[in-house]
């Protein structure tokens, strides 16, 4: 059973490590798990619980610094007499959604914060229980050690995965907003680079062939989107076309674009701050 337990713990460790960024966090995880391996130590679960709780605390503090949580538009102190007191739940919330509003998280990102927060809070409460050495928490049997430590690490890993999932969904939302902006740029606004080529033009579609992140700071993401826009050029009026005096041709033109997307603001949403789209019509004149 002990070998089976060690394999379980090692598997969980390998799953958790990629989410830890600092050498301190990684060393603390290693030290926490080392406590569990010492079968002769009657305090092994207590020592593990203390180290694991501190790891979670440091991880949350890194992802949700005091100043950021306090400035989040959704933040309200639980105790008006302690306006700068931050609860564990508020740190968990910031780690997952940052400045984004609850409405945006629920309806756009589709993330259930309550379930994740509840599971992690339960795990931390379990850890706290074993950091207090009492007769019932001292020298516990291997089955209890296995059950408690496994559930705690599973909930911790689930929390880490939720944060990563939130980041991925923010990225997907940014991509979707860029696509919507390109629709507006090509289908609603008049593109002078295309308009000068014919009497009338019609956009048939566009294709983004490359979308890359150029830069990211604590408020904005700068994205670059390159691709092609397919257009139909009409020479002559609609009347000319009916009389057979006009003509239409279809061409494909390359475009490049840059977008600055704001993801951290007091509106609690994600929106495009600026968009620059350039269509290259040089190939038309070659």
Regions found by a protein language model. Give the residues of each.
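Short, well-structured alpha-helical interface segments that form or flank functional binding sites
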Residues: 24-27, 43-54, 115-118, 122, ...
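Short, hydrophobic, well-ordered secondary-structure elements
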Residues: 33, 44-67
């Amino acid at each position: 059973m002990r070998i089976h337990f060690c394999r379980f713990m090692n598997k969980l460790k390998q799953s958790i490590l990629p989410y830890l960024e600092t050498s301190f966090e990684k060393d603390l995880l290693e030290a926490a798990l080392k406590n569990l391996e010492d079968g002769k130590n009657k305090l092994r679960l207590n020592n593990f619980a203390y180290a694991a709780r501190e790891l979670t605390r440091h991880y949350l503090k890194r992802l949700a610094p005091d100043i950021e949580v306090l400035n989040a538009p959704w933040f309200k102190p639980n105790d008006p007499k302690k306006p700068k007191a931050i609860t564990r739940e508020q740190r968990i919330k910031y780690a997952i959604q940052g400045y984004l509003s609850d409405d945006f998280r629920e309806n756009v990102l589709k993330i259930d914060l309550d379930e994740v927060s509840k599971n992690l809070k339960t795990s931390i409460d379990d850890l706290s229980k074993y950091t207090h050495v009492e007769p019932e928490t001292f020298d516990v049997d291997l089955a209890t050690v296995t059950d408690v430590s496994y559930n705690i690490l599973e909930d911790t890993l689930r929390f880490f995965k939720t944060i990563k999932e939130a980041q991925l969904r923010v990225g997907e939302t940014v991509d979707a907003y860029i696509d919507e902006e390109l629709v507006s740029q090509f289908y609603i606004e008049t593109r002078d680079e295309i308009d000068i080529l014919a009497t009338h033009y019609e956009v048939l579609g566009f294709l983004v062939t490359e979308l890359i992140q150029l830069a990211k700071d604590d408020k904005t993401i700068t994205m670059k989107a390159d691709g092609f826009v397919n257009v139909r050029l009409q020479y002559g009026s609609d009347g000319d076309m009916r009389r057979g005096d006009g003509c239409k041709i279809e061409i494909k033109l390359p475009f490049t674009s840059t977008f600055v997307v704001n993801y951290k603001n007091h509106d609690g949403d994600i929106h495009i701050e600026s968009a620059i789209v350039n269509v290259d019509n040089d190939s038309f004149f070659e």
